[in-house]
Amino acid sequence: MHSQGTRRYTKSMMTPTPYPAPDFTALSLDGTTRSLADFRGKWVVLYFYPKDDTPGCTIEACSLRDVRDDIAALGAEVVGVSADDASSHEKFKAKHSLNFTLLSDPDLTMIKAYDAWGKKQFGREGILRRTFLISPEGQVMKIYGRVTPLGHGEQIVAELKKLQAA
């Protein structure tokens, strides 16, 4: 985990200075390894969430599912990441008709590279709910460090439109 002094974004994480997104490799549901390069040329909505099929994570995933067509129309792809295994992801995806990619990061390598691991309530450590908007050139353009699951999808659509108009 980065020390406080080496983070490349503001403490509030609301408006980062664009910087290269950390490369990653993670397993998809079909067992193939996906990397950041697989998404080059598209905007990526990369979101980290604590656990499949829990209340907040389900609300967030369904919020993104419901606006996926709007996100796709903006040339973006949604990618969700947690430490859950492929079997858990498959059940979560089927139960809630999720229409986007889910990646498994059981060893937390990608999660930690994106600084989505840290202290949570009551001093416990775990996966932090965070979303990164990555440009087609692989630059992190926006970080949501404190995500409210309800309505997050609409928030992402509005921000993608704003970034693309700039």
Predicted regions and their residues:
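Chalcogenol-based redox active-site neighborhoods
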Residues: H2, R8-A166
